[in-house]
């Protein structure tokens, strides 16, 4: 496999970047659109949808279940019924949203559906969700990939207890389909911790937008009443988690990066993202439907609890590795990342140390002491976030090469081009020189890849 030479930024990065739609919001909208169609409420449209491997896997899954998805690029329409054909088989790839959102949907059908995925996906946690479906009366063969869901055309619902300590997607997957259960659903989280709670809040917010009656007023308990899921138009926000990699370029280079279309009010964890950037002395400015981040002249190590936003960990770890030499950063609340696309804690520790850094694992996180890094190969482990972290480190460390930049197709197929355009020509990529007088580069992703 050919390595990708990460562009360096010897001067402050100054760029405007347009990132495609949110993967998390796109795949939730697709599931809700499928449920509305299955209830006979009509077709839903999704505008600004992300087109990446994860969302293509979701589109394929819905079509496997018998639904119809029309449209090109980022404009999609979902219609039809849940009527899987004989031998229906869903490929989850490495997509946690497909792995955990689609089985409850398949349980509403009347034909067995087999689920499988990439070899690496077979280590991702799924047993608590399958056990919950069994508790609700669904016949499920298997305890992990591959497994089979044997629906009988309806699902009574009721009350279920589940330990979602390994993934908040267990809760979201149940809640998304719950309004179509005969008696609705009450979900009680029984674990000691709940990672990525903002993503459950996103699920609840989108359910309300679809007219679903959901009560999440009691901590660790959610109740969805049976009823209609409205067909509607879904407008997808830019993917703010993907945007963090680009904003990190402003932080590590002391430059200025503007993200277009940044929402004033978001179903994504925008407040958590901005709080971390400010903790690193970045200046954050909302203006003209965009977000501008001005990086500091330098920053020291930092302590941050990433329990709510574990997806940011690789980017934040890269920032920690590039802090003032000798300063220490402590990243906590992220033990659950050991069950993500790869064991992200082990992967980050290994790769930072291989480049001469100092990183060690703790029971629930990482401790990183910033030390001068050297050139070398940064391994992505087929993980999109790991690949992006390598790109961030490469901004400051000449000679870093990412072994699998194609891993970014999972959520941002155009990442290499957007990154190169942001950093600018002459840094290892043959892009045209900016026009005379052009002050800031613009990198635009249309989300049509994958």
Swiss-Prot record:
One of its GO terms (biological process) is chorismate biosynthetic process. PANTHER family: AROM/DEHYDROQUINATE SYNTHASE (PTHR21090), PENTAFUNCTIONAL AROM POLYPEPTIDE (PTHR21090:SF5). It is an enzyme of class 2 (transferase). Residues 426-450 are annotated as: Disordered. Its EC number is 2.5.1.19. InterPro entries: Enolpyruvate_Tfrase_dom, Enolpyruvate_Tfrase_sf, EPSP_synthase, EPSP_synthase_CS, RNA3'P_cycl/enolpyr_Trfase_a/b. It catalyses: 3-phosphoshikimate + phosphoenolpyruvate = 5-O-(1-carboxyvinyl)-3-phosphoshikimate + phosphate. Monomer. Keywords: Amino-acid biosynthesis, Aromatic amino acid biosynthesis, Cytoplasm, Transferase. This is 3-phosphoshikimate 1-carboxyvinyltransferase. The keyword Chaperone does not apply. 3-phosphoshikimate binds at residues 24, 28, 167-169, 196, 311, 340. GO terms for cellular component: cytosol; plasma membrane. The active site is at residue 311. GO terms for molecular function: 3-phosphoshikimate 1-carboxyvinyltransferase activity. It comes from the Bacteria. Pfam families: EPSP_synthase (PF00275). Catalyzes the transfer of the enolpyruvyl moiety of phosphoenolpyruvate (PEP) to the 5-hydroxyl of shikimate-3-phosphate (S3P) to produce enolpyruvyl shikimate-3-phosphate and inorganic phosphate. Disulfide bonds: none annotated. Phosphoenolpyruvate binds at residues 23, 96, 124, 169, 344, 385, 410. It is found in: Cytoplasm. Signal peptide: none annotated.
